[in-house]
């Protein structure tokens, strides 16, 4: 998720916690736990407090991309690391390759705190192997001073009053996906006929598109170039920080989101400590510290009242879907309709 959204807040200078950058570290000592994830994923005090409470020292090792993580974990045959945090799609691959062990639910009793919206996902349908850490949710944000309609869902983006006024991110599967949600279809549709209908629907949106841009898309909203934007999580956070009067829309058709999940590798040197750490992270106060620090959406319902309200999905939102891999034929069709859509926007 960090690689997709470039939303990392760099980790502070390390105080009392070992750091290894992009390398495999093996914790031989049962009083050590090797944590493997992106840089900047935890406030230092959370790691320090875990050591104070348990006597277990956290050895923090980081990777730059999900693919790097999977390669390192494969080379280690599921060993070397105790807790890994990565994106949903790569966790799916790790589970299928036998590199992940089941969570000890007796130890991880705080799993009950996880918002049901984020449970039972495609990569772990029975919630046996992973625990959500945070979610990335691209959302519609608009300036109510510049927009004459009350935007409630994706379908409203097609309103004629929004001609040449919408800025969107450039992730083709996400944009195709929200178009499908507006049509009452799945974001992961593989039927070519339905994908073609999605393409036609997208072309109808083209007159309303002001720009397609992945980086700093929120700036178009903030400087008045666009009055509506569809933004990544970090961009939503930045937009609201700079202009609290902007409105955020949780689309009535349902959310499209991605999840960062915690898991214990199949041959983790210190699996007991790993499960203790995951349970500790799920304590409401600890979880709130982490979410407020990284700026992703809260997946721990017990922490909702402790988290910045802009990072909490309303209780009224009960539907969501994650973009998944599709067949090669479907993928080619998605690329085709995206190319045609961009041409129509020019």
What are these regions (language model features)?
Residues 1-33, 345-346:
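Short, low-complexity disordered leader/linker segments with a strong preference
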Residues 91-93, 228-245:
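A ligand-binding cleft/hinge motif common to bilobed small-molecule-binding domains
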Residues 28-93:
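Early extracytoplasmic/lumenal segment of secretory-pathway proteins
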Residues 256, 260, 265-323:
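Mature extracytoplasmic/periplasmic domains
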Residues 80-81, 85-208, 213-222:
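Extracytoplasmic ligand-binding site segments that recognize negatively charged/polar headgroups
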Residues 307-346:
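Extracellular/periplasmic bilobal clamshell ligand-binding domains
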Residues 196-204, 242-266:
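Periplasmic-binding protein-like
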Residues 69-70, 91, 154, 217-220, ...:
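Short, hydrophobic alpha-helical packing/hinge segments within bilobed ligand-binding/sensory domains
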